[in-house]
Amino acid sequence: MPVLNLRSDFAEADALPEQMGAIGRRARAAARRMALASARTKDAALKLIAERIRASRDEILSENARDVAAARCAGQTAALIDRLTLDPGRLAAIADAVEKVGSLADPVGRQLAAIERPNGLLIERIAVPLGVVGVIFEARPNVTADAGALCLKAGNAAILRAGSDSHRSAMAIARAMSRGLADAGLPEDAIQLVPTRDRAAVGLMLAGLDGCVDVIVPRGGRGLVERVQAEARVPVFAHLDGINHVYVAAAADLDMARTVLLNSKMRRTSVCGAAETLLVDRACAATHLAPLVQALLDAGCAVRGDAATRAVDPRVTAASEEDWHTEYLDAIIAVRVVDGIEAAIEHIETYGSHHTDAIITENDAEATRFLAEVDSAIVTHNASTQFADGGEFGFGAEIGIATGRMHARGPVGVEQLTTFKYRVHGTGQIRP
């Protein structure tokens, strides 16, 4: 099938670079057609893709069972196997999520700005697709559908490279998506899955496939993201770590602080928006520190703290320098008492990852300062760090979270998968 790239130019290629180059060229050709697709056509395609995923349930679950069995034989962790595993409910949710993307507003063609010049020129800034998006992911087969759907909605073509653990599952989902694209009359090459486990394919994608890849989005662990950021010769939308902080200021309401802290840390400990460090203003430590630490411990969270924190509960263990740098993704948190907002901001600047940081305070001036000075993609006031999510932002879905400064920052949804062009309308003007 086309999604497998089993065409003559691919099947006869002797070398992986030639094979990957063929995928890139087909993606570029598909991207040109996708950029012109109407909103109605794209939405119809998403609905048809969702239907194809549902209709392919037995095939997808069978291939997923093979992936899971192989992962167990390879001794993979329970956490990875859980991320890898699909069941009828999870697969139905994947199909529903694809269909939901179709209900989002079309990001393409929006007028972002209009300028009328004194000489009569009308200049418009218009949203257009990025082009070809390369997505490299590991054990979550749902990324195949999520990333493909978001790229399609934004008028892009996608080249997807699944990890070895999820390869069979991803291929089965991609086959269903290819059928849905064909049903809608859109190019099947708009969503291609790299049909090899060879890791050299990743390097070729990072090199840009001879100019065919416009941006790379990695979805996976630190090792993958580090490699992508180090080797990519095209722009990258990614975050390396989620070392997120909750700062409880002197003017914080204790009940609110406790509720927000517990949600930030314990709602889901393994997500990138989970809090990893609690900072407490020394001015309120006498009233706030012990109750907050007790709440964490009672919720099953291990606490590693500085001397002031260890003094309030014997269950607290000593925090090392490494703890302030650590993204636990587990029921563990580091706690430090700081001398006011300036020290809190300095700590976040030194140890943070520019992902998501929160302040709990009833002092508006203090909140304003924190929101302005903390240099993170997402900064919250009296709200959980776990709102770091495209769905919670009203984006409908996200392809990831970016902490860089160029183009996309924070949740990367369909709007962030577009760029812009200028349209200049004249009546014969020439430049003097």
From Swiss-Prot:
GO molecular function: glutamate-5-semialdehyde dehydrogenase activity; NADP binding
EC number: 1.2.1.41
Keyword NADP set for record: yes
Pathways per UniProt: Amino-acid biosynthesis; L-proline biosynthesis; L-glutamate 5-semialdehyde from L-glutamate: step 2/2
Entry annotated with the keyword NAD: no
PROSITE patterns reported in the protein's UniProt record: PROA
Gene3D superfamilies found in the cross-reference section: Aldehyde Dehydrogenase, Chain A, domain 1, Aldehyde Dehydrogenase, Chain A, domain 2
Leading EC class: oxidoreductase
Gene Ontology CC entries for this record: cytoplasm
Keywords assigned: Amino-acid biosynthesis, Cytoplasm, NADP, Oxidoreductase, Proline biosynthesis
Catalytic activity: L-glutamate 5-semialdehyde + phosphate + NADP(+) = L-glutamyl 5-phosphate + NADPH + H(+)
SUPFAM superfamilies in the cross-refs: ALDH-like
GO biological process: L-proline biosynthetic process
Taxonomy, superkingdom: Bacteria
Subcellular localization: Cytoplasm
Function field: Catalyzes the NADPH-dependent reduction of L-glutamate 5-phosphate into L-glutamate 5-semialdehyde and phosphate. The product spontaneously undergoes cyclization to form 1-pyrroline-5-carboxylate.
Family membership noted in the UniProt record: Belongs to the gamma-glutamyl phosphate reductase family.
HAMAP family (alphabetical): ProA
Identification of the protein by name: Gamma-glutamyl phosphate reductase
Organism for this UniProt entry: Methylobacterium radiotolerans (strain ATCC 27329 / DSM 1819 / JCM 2831 / NBRC 15690 / NCIMB 10815 / 0-1)
Gene: proA
